[in-house]
């Protein structure tokens, strides 16, 4: 470690190929957990809508419209996760 008077400088060695692969696996697992969470929210939302329909609070047309909207939001969020994963993997593998 070095000291330039105002900051402590700590040299960090470059990542090895093995460590890069480990980080990629970690990123992949985090993104997969995110996808699962998004799908669980979708499932819960659709389940709640169906319960509302069974109770007679909401019409079938409104249920279908909201299910489609929930699916669009789900697809959008999963696409964002995929984009983030691709960007991060490229960043990690960059030498």
Predicted regions and their residues:
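Positively charged, low-complexity, intrinsically disordered RNA-binding extensions
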Residues: 8-95
């Amino acid at each position: 470690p070095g000291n330039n008077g105002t900051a402590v400088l700590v040299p960090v060695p470059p990542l090895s190929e093995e460590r890069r692969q480990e980080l990629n696996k970690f990123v992949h697992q985090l993104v997969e957990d995110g996808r699962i969470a998004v799908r669980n929210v979708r499932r819960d939302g659709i389940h709640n809508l169906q319960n509302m329909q069974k109770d007679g609070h909401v019409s079938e047309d409104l249920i279908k419209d909201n299910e489609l909207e929930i699916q669009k939001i789900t697809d959008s969020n999963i696409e964002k996760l995929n984009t983030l994963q691709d960007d991060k993997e490229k960043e990690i593998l960059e030498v």
